[in-house]
């Protein structure tokens, strides 16, 4: 497939292709951070009322004051239609979403109520470190939404400040420098708009949505008196309040650190997508908008918000793809701090496949023998029960197979996870097996290319595999 490089300059050419076109009526998806699952008429009336009938072209939620040079970092041209088509997304658009964790020492003028305390509370600001970083592509042509998680500890060049962890870019230069840093890391991808939401806003947002039903993979306990951060969650499927969900999102004290946290974030995002299919979410519009007003900073205009939410509200969950910047943990004593070291070649491949950038190297097909395939059992079965599955894979040329630790959540349907973003190879595995569901997300074994999370449907097919692998 011929790809087009969507640098900031070339996005202008790309959007000319889409300008003036109506979005197709079958566009699918759901936009998490604002009002996933909202119907068009309810969104328009709700936003117009909550934002006090401001001009559709204004940016009433923007709290940062950007200089002309900083504004130029973002492609400011239209992303929505004209006239009656204002709620339609007219071209692919990349949004940089930053989740902020801000403590009083991070700001020049901390709120009076945060002073003279014996701990450092989270405050309603956007000046601190980026705790969560996502590049989200809304694409009306493919009818897909792609979320790319950028680990906060990624080692990269921050213009004017040297090699640092990427989460420091916001402290050094706000959303514009962060966008420029992310773009440089990801091969020059154009970034159209930004959104910053702080920790206080995330908790309130999930609470306004009614909480979330999610599987907590293990008991989580953590205590930090200096911030009054207390995490106490039990393993298992359960309903979490906004505050409890925030605990799950922030927990990073396990063997995978920030990468494990990204995996849990993707699990929560997936759960929210499925949960908000319920039309009763419409009743939560006022609460959600209040959260947006108080805890959001974005250069999106009102009509752009409507267009994005309108597109998102019609996206099928199967068209939501969740990726992570490829890389590795730094070795002990390799650097002065621990980092996620990005892998440039893998990044180039991923950006070409999912964000339309020009491939810098010739694309190579994924040969089965080169793919690292992890198997995670969710059924609690004896490992010997997986032998027919492994033999079938080996017979088809998948020779680099390993058993990973079990997947804690019991699954009815096997998940074939494209851990490294190689959806085509995951589809090939699914076709070989004849059962399971492909998921493009980063919740599998981080050392794998493909992770097979075995569900109960394996038992329905096990006899067939046993017969086919007998000599």
Positions of the model-derived regions?
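Non-catalytic, solvent-exposed segments at the cell envelope interface
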Residues: 2-471
């Amino acid at each position: 497939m011929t790809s087009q490089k969507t640098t900031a300059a070339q996005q202008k050419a790309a959007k000319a292709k889409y300008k003036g076109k109506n979005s197709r009526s079958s566009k699918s998806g759901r936009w998490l951070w604002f009002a996933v699952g909202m119907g068009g008429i309810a969104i328009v009336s709700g936003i117009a009322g909550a934002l006090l009938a401001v001009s559709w072209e204004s940016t009433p939620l923007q709290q940062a004051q950007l200089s002309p040079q900083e504004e130029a970092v973002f492609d400011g041209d239209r992303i929505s239609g004209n006239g009656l088509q204002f709620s339609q997304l007219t071209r692919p658009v990349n949004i940089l979403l930053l989740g902020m964790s801000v403590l009083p020492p991070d700001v020049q003028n901390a709120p009076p109520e945060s002073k003279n305390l014996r701990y450092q509370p989270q405050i309603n600001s956007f000046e601190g470190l980026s705790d969560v970083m996502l590049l989200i592509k809304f694409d009306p042509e493919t009818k897909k939404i792609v979320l790319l998680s950028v680990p906060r500890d990624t080692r990269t060049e921050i213009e004017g400040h040297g090699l640092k962890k990427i989460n420091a870019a916001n402290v050094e230069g706000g959303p514009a420098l962060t966008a420029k840093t992310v773009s440089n890391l990801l091969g020059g991808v154009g970034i159209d708009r930004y959104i910053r939401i702080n920790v206080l806003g995330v908790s309130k947002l999930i609470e306004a949505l009614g909480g979330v039903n999610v599987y907590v993979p293990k008991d989580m306990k953590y205590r930090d008196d200096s911030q009054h951060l207390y995490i106490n969650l039990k393993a298992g499927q359960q309903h979490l309040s906004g505050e409890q969900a925030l605990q799950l999102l922030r927990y990073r004290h396990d063997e995978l650190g920030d990468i494990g946290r990204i995996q849990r974030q993707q699990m929560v995002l997936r759960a929210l997508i499925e949960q908000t299919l319920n039309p009763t979410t419409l009743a939560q519009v006022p609460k959600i908008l209040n959260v947006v007003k108080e805890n959001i900073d974005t250069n999106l205009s009102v009509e752009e918000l409507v267009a994005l939410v309108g597109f998102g509200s019609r996206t099928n969950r199967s068209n939501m793809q969740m990726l992570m910047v490829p890389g590795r943990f730094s070795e002990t004593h390799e650097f002065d701090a621990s980092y996620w070291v990005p892998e440039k070649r893998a990044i180039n491949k991923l950006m070409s496949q999912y964000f339309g950038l020009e491939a810098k190297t010739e694309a190579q097909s994924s040969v089965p023998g080169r793919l690292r395939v992890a198997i995670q059992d969710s059924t609690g079965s004896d490992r010997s029960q997986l032998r027919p599955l492994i033999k079938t894979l080996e017979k088809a040329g998948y020779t680099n197979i390993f058993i990973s630790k079990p997947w804690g959540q019991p699954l009815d349907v096997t998940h074939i996870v494209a851990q490294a973003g190689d959806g085509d190879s995951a589809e090939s595995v699914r076709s070989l097996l004849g059962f399971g569901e492909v998921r493009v997300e980063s919740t599998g074994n981080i050392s794998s290319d493909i992770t097979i999370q075995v569900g109960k449907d394996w038992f329905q097919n096990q006899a067939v595999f046993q017969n086919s692998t007998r000599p």
